[in-house]
Curated annotation (Swiss-Prot):
Pfam families: ABC_tran (PF00005). PANTHER family: AMINO ACID IMPORT ATP-BINDING PROTEIN, PHOSPHONATES IMPORT ATP-BINDING PROTEIN PHNC. This is Phosphonates import ATP-binding protein PhnC. It is found in: Cell membrane. InterPro entries: AAA+_ATPase, ABC_transporter-like_ATP-bd, ABC_transporter-like_CS, ABC_transpr_PhnC, MetN_ABC_transporter-like, P-loop_NTPase. The complex is composed of two ATP-binding proteins (PhnC), two transmembrane proteins (PhnE) and a solute-binding protein (PhnD). Residues 9-253 form the ABC transporter domain. It comes from Lactobacillus gasseri (strain ATCC 33323 / DSM 20243 / BCRC 14619 / CIP 102991 / JCM 1131 / KCTC 3163 / NCIMB 11718 / NCTC 13722 / AM63). Keywords: ATP-binding, Cell membrane, Membrane, Nucleotide-binding, Phosphonate transport, Translocase, Transport. It catalyses: phosphonate(out) + ATP + H2O = phosphonate(in) + ADP + phosphate + H(+).
Length: 261
């Protein structure tokens, strides 16, 4: 029987090297517990997106093992892999909505993993799941847009539809890859508030890549700094100074804004 205090996400000596030799991740060892709200910060190209995409196995790692609630997603196949992924919700910078479909239909895709393909192809969702989708839209204040086409919404509204889709999926984990990168400051804070709501009210573990240090400070409970594919800082947000953020981004060399190779 698995220990009750096992990490929700565990990376053991994980590395990712791309075909062209670029190092995406190098010797990552990381535990994230159930219910944490973790923000990952670092320069563009530091490895933040590679980290999240590896956790959900959107890309395979070159070395090491990744466990989701005690189960290896690295070695999982077929039904086992699908069941693990069902517990992981993804939120992307580009929203990943079907633009010509209604808001409701987009939110219902959060339930796809619970159905055989032929049922979702013909939109044969149960009344219970349609109710779940509607209630999720209520939580993000978009119930009045239920039959609106996704491409008629603003960027902020589209991202909130993506959050409602994740809520309908009811995962244990949410991975948010730069969820506010294309949004204005006010809308960004609203999206982060919605993610915090999923974390606090539903107990979902959230790992979010953020380019905004201010948003990271406001919403994160724990901060992980990534530079050149390695974790260079891991600590409580309440104990993390501005000097630490400066070091994560500048590498202690004083060259602010320097891009990764």
């Amino acid at each position: 029987m698995a220990a009750t205090n096992q990490p929700m996400i565990q990376l053991k000596d994980v590395s990712k090297i791309y075909d062209n030799g670029t190092v995406g991740l190098k010797d990552i060892n990381l535990n994230i517990d159930k219910g944490e709200f973790v923000v990952v910060v670092g320069l563009s190209g530091a490895g933040k997106s590679t980290l999240l995409r590896s956790i959900n196995r959107l890309q395979d790692v070159s070395k090491g093992d990744i466990l989701i609630d005690g189960k290896s997603i690295t070695s999982a196949k077929g039904k086992d892999l699908r069941e693990i992924r069902r517990d992981i919700g993804m939120i992307f910078q580009s929203f990943n909505l079907v633009k010509r479909s209604s808001v409701l239909r987009n939110v219902l895709t959060g339930r796809v993993a619970y159905y055989p393909t032929w049922k979702t192809t013909f939109n044969l969702f149960t009344k219970e799941d349609k109710q779940k989708a509607y209630e999720a839209l209520q939580r993000v204040d978009l119930a009045d847009k239920v039959y609106t086409r996704a491409d008629q919404l603003s960027g902020g509204q589209q991202q909130r539809v993506a959050i409602a889709r994740v809520l309908t999926q009811n995962p244990k984990i949410i991975l948010a890859d730069e969820p506010t990168a294309s949004l204005d400051p006010q809308t960004s804070r609203r999206v982060m508030h919605d993610l915090k709501m999923l974390n606090e009210e539903y107990g979902m573990t959230v790992v979010a890549n953020l380019h905004s240090v201010e948003l990271a400070k406001e919403f994160g409970d724990r901060v992980i700094g990534v530079r050149a594919g390695q974790i260079v800082y891991d600590g409580k947000m309440s104990e993390t100074s501005q000097a630490v953020f400066d070091d994560i981004y500048n590498g202690g060399n004083g060259k602010k804004g320097e891009e990764d190779a």
